[in-house]
Regions:
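Basic, short loop/linker segments at the boundary and entry of helix-turn-helix/winged-helix-like folds
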Residues: 8-55
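Aromatic-lined, polymer-binding surfaces characteristic
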Residues: 79
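Short, flexible loop/hinge motifs at secondary-structure junctions
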Residues: 1-7, 311, 320
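Serine-centered coil/turn micro-motif
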Residues: 2, 10-16, 393, 441
Length: 502
């Protein structure tokens, strides 16, 4: 089967048990040139066929290349799409991993068709991201210092085992024991050498936009270690800008970082050709920063970016604490509260504010150190025990946290905060305050309230309905291509459900 420069793309989506085809022309000249047949060898598979197979497989939640190969041999729909050619899984994997530039053109072509059908309203674009794991191990993350320490530990362990093995050479050991010891020494040496080789290839640590240190990863150094509500993952953040009219994804990017603040401006710049002067951009508090708001104002972009205190200022949510459910203990990642002190507290001492005296639980009077001592911004009276009373006291263990090192007890009775001068009020005319003022208006709340219903169902469709919940490739270039494929499946489904006008 020869390759064609123009593909009549078949959009297959399952709706009510039926497969609905939609057709339009997409130029695949670049993809054809890259997969052109050689003068020798077997004919190349047409990229049009491979793209149809991969896209339909993704729409069914089939992402692994071996699984796609299997259904091409066993499933009648895939057999029809591939023309009974049943491409090998290595061919499918190579096609997907080298598809970024080509799939970007297909994504743009499908977006143009959606625009021609009136599915892009340009009234509001909601920007958000989803953190997905990738084909990388989070256990192989660390800084150069941590990798160096691991290599030294492995080398030390290998040396210790080798010395022990040499010391027992004269003994009559079981052959299996000697073979296992030799294999373990070789494995430790190999792992240490792999770390040394990686350190030689990567002489510098990863740095963030502000110069902060970021952990590298030896399986995929472009990925990032990110915290989610389900735990820590090693992967990428898939960012999408979704139009509010029909939930069409108008821009899709993938980045190896969990910091959303640095992902806003790349999406805004990519939307410059698509949005109008009246298009509203919305994003949640993860994208809020003074630098981002200043950049949006400089670009004259109309946007509503939530700040972390937006809900606290909303009077409609004044009684939100009453409706808060108990936290799930399995997902509570906060640090446990420190245990209650087992020593005597100031309430256990007898304090006379008028006489300015203090008596400890053992009945001994304490010396007053001052009437206006300041501790952490609080003013009060401080008392100190006498050494002749505290050292031989029988209640010493119940009075001092470290009786073996502390000689006497100190206690303070605070009266209130130290009066300070009023802090200067922040400037009123800043990008942050202006954004807050817009968000706090009824119109701003109504506009921003549409963000959640616009972008979150898109991620739900991709992750749960389509089961496209992880990246199977390594390297940002390949992951961007796969994320575009994920978003392309969503857009084609939206287009098919909306109907195709003549």
């Amino acid at each position: 089967m020869s390759s064609r420069s123009v593909l009549t793309t078949c959009a297959m989506v399952v709706t009510c048990g039926a497969v609905i085809p939609q057709f339009w022309s997409v130029d695949l000249a670049r993809c054809d040139a890259r997969l052109r047949n050689d003068t020798t060898g077997a004919p190349a598979y047409p990229p049009a066929m491979l793209l149809k197979v991969v896209r339909f497989a993704y729409s069914q939640g089939i992402v692994r290349s071996r699984a796609i190969e299997r259904v091409c041999r066993e499933h009648v729909t895939f057999m029809a799409l591939c023309g009974m050619s049943a491409p090998h899984f290595t061919t499918i994997a190579h096609f997907v991993s080298t598809l970024r530039d080509d799939i970007a053109q297909v994504f743009a072509a499908v977006l143009a068709v959606c625009d021609g059908q009136g599915l892009i309203g340009r009234e509001m674009f909601a920007i958000d991201g989803v953190k997905l794991p990738s084909n990388a191990s989070k256990h192989r993350s660390g800084t150069r210092a941590e990798f160096t320490q691991r290599a030294e530990k492995l080398e030390a362990a290998a040396t210790t085992m080798l010395d022990r093995h040499r010391a027992t050479d004269a003994l009559d050991l079981e052959p299996d024991v000697a073979a296992k010891t030799t294999a373990r020494i070789a494995r430790l040496t190999r792992d240490a050498q792999q770390l040394r080789d990686w350190l030689a290839i990567h002489p510098h640590d990863r740095r963030g936009p502000t110069g902060g240190l970021r952990k590298s990863n030896r399986t995929d150094n472009a990925s990032a270690k990110m915290a989610t509500d389900k735990g820590v993952i090693q992967g990428y953040t898939g960012v999408a800008a979704v139009d509010a009219a029909h939930q069409i994804i108008v821009n899709a990017q993938a980045h190896g970082t969990g910091s959303e603040q640095e992902l806003l401006l790349p999406v805004v710049d990519a939307l410059a050709a698509l949005r109008t002067s009246e298009t509203l951009l919305t994003a949640d508090a993860g994208y809020h920063s003074a630098a981002n708001l200043a950049a949006l104002a400089e670009r004259e972009v109309t946007a509503l970016i939530a700040d972390p205190d937006m809900r606290q200022r909303d009077e409609r949510l004044a009684d939100r604490a009453h409706h808060t459910t108990a936290p799930d203990p399995l997902h509570d990642k906060s640090r446990p509260a420190p245990p209650a002190s087992s020593v005597f507290t100031p309430e256990d001492f007898t304090y006379d504010a008028d006489a300015r005296t203090c008596v400890c639980p053992a009945g001994k009077s304490l010396y007053r150190k001052g009437a206006a001592n300041v501790t952490n911004g609080y003013v009060g009276e401080h008392f100190r025990g006498a050494k002749r009373d505290c050292v031989p006291c029988a209640l010493r263990a119940a009075c001092l946290r470290t009786p073996e090192t502390t000689l006497v007890r100190n206690v303070a009775f605070l009266r209130g905060r130290v009066p300070t001068e009023a802090a200067p009020s922040p400037p009123k005319d800043t990008h942050t305050t202006r954004m807050q003022q817009r968000l706090d208006t009824p119109a701003g709340r109504a506009q921003y309230g549409r963000r959640f219903a616009t972008v979150e169902p898109v991620f739900a469709n991709i992750r749960f309905n389509k089961r496209l919940d992880r990246f199977t490739l390594r390297g940002r270039t390949k992951v961007v291509g796969q994320w575009l494929l994920f978003c392309l499946v969503h857009n084609i489904e939206k287009l098919a459900h909306a109907g195709y006008a003549a």
